[in-house]
Amino acid sequence: MTTARIFGIGRHRLTVDGEGVTTLVTFNGCPLRCKYCLNKTSWDMDKGRDYTPESLFEEVKIDQLYFLATHGGVTFGGGEPLLQKEFIKEFRALCGPQWQIVVETSLNVPFEIVEEMNAVVDGYIVDIKDMNPEIYLTYTGKENTLVMKNLEWILQHGDAKHIKVRVPHIPEYNTDEDVAKNVEILKGMGVVDIDEFNYVIR
């Protein structure tokens, strides 16, 4: 039986995490250690509770009418949702193609996971952090080689309209010039939906 630790389920999110009305499901577990992480709960596997795909489906299907009427569905975040690929695949089999399934991801996962999941999900929200390898490493504690490889691949094998890339201004880590360069590179790669924003430091 597939299980995953989930620390949050947020209902009735309108156009924040994808099209229409969505429910945001946040998994524990993340390969990054971002300095300004907003979901540090995801680092602690003792927080939250365990779900099976079936128990999660039973909990969130209360909003099915909203999902169908607005072309919404479930967005999986975290933490890093792509680390829970079997869970998401089984959940997709339960909800069927009518619900939109989106992953909010760093893409800092093995390429094989992205390749396998591309046919399962309907869209991506990619938190790119910064495309400069040195800035990325300093801010997250990890290299961004996998991120770049995976982003290039999903742009080649998916629908760019369903790939949103979030580009943050990160205080003390990148500059406005860095962000402008990130946006320029992303446009050159074929990204059409770019969300530039300021990190809020808690």
Each PLM stretch: what is its role?
Residues 1-45, 62-70:
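N-terminal [4Fe-4S]-dependent radical SAM core
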Residues 48:
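Conserved H-D interstitial segment of serine endopeptidase catalytic domains
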